[in-house]
Amino acid sequence: EKKIKRSEFVERLPALSNSRWGGIKKGDGDRLVADILKRGADAVSELIEGLKEVDSGEDWQERLLLHQLAIHCSVPARADDRKVLAGLYASAALSKRPATVRSFILQQLRYFADATHAPGLLPLLADEDPLVLDAVTALMVSMGSATEKILEKARRDSKGHARVAI
């Protein structure tokens, strides 16, 4: 497996504990998310690159930070951050990364993506991997009735697991 340089932001997380921020104080966690967003797309992409195919816990910091970014961007007043993050997450979901990674990213999109993001994710409704297919279908359903026509068309054109999932 190719060695990926880990994001400097993961080093700011303490040892894992059973709490919302994995042991970091809420204010420190909020500053950490703000610093990542301030650094921009490269910082978020670096976290995504750090995700492992097998969720063995080795990449818990990247997963926690990507999740906290999604939660942060779910606040209505953060539309600018949400737009940037949605684009980065959608790009990662559409990439050739392992299905487990793409599925995780799609799960995070459920926290803040809306129906305007659905057309860009349409190719994933034909994905051959059930993990990705289930995650994108759940995402589209969570976007509400605005995605109904997209899902109906995708279901008509689908076969196998896709037909059941959609």
Where are these regions (language model features)?
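Surface-facing alpha-helical segments and adjacent helix-coil boundary elements at the starts of domains
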Residues: 50-54, 63, 71-72, 86-92
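Alpha-helical scaffold repeats of the Armadillo/HEAT/TPR superfamily
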Residues: 83-88, 129, 158-160
